[in-house]
Amino acid sequence: GGEGERIPAWCRRVVQDEETKIFSAQVWQPKKPYEFKKKAFKPTKSPLLIYECHVGMGQDAEKVGTYREFTENVLPRVVKAGYNCIQVMAIQEHPYYGSFGYHVSSFFAPSSRFGTPDELKELIDTAHKNGIAVIMDIVHSHAVKNEMEGLGNLCGDPCQYFYQGG
């Protein structure tokens, strides 16, 4: 129970191997980390007009979109339409894309299928530069019980993160 290689529950970057489909923790240390251009963003005091979006599905192309594509192609349309906030869905790492991001495996890691942590930071920074607040749609009760890439049986205790029989 709980033996073997596991992804740490607090990991901040998880990637999936294209061939084996196995997820692994990864240290993200770019030579030049992203520096936010908009240092102190404050959202508007007027009511939020929220555009709910999914980075992977918010594309014209029939593929999983990226943070960069969203920043370049979708965000300008959101700004032009007059929204002052985006609510980004499915942002945490999740093994099954069809879950719409609600079977979270790594709560502290942004989904690597959309790009790098720095590309996500650039998306947020660009939104802020355009006066757009960013809300992350994070649902703490939607975790996968998977043992390979999730929190199931993490330390040999199936009840550490989940109720028995749930």
Regions inferred by a protein language model and the residue ranges of each:
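Substrate-binding/active-site clefts of carbohydrate-active enzymes
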Residues: 39-45, 54-166
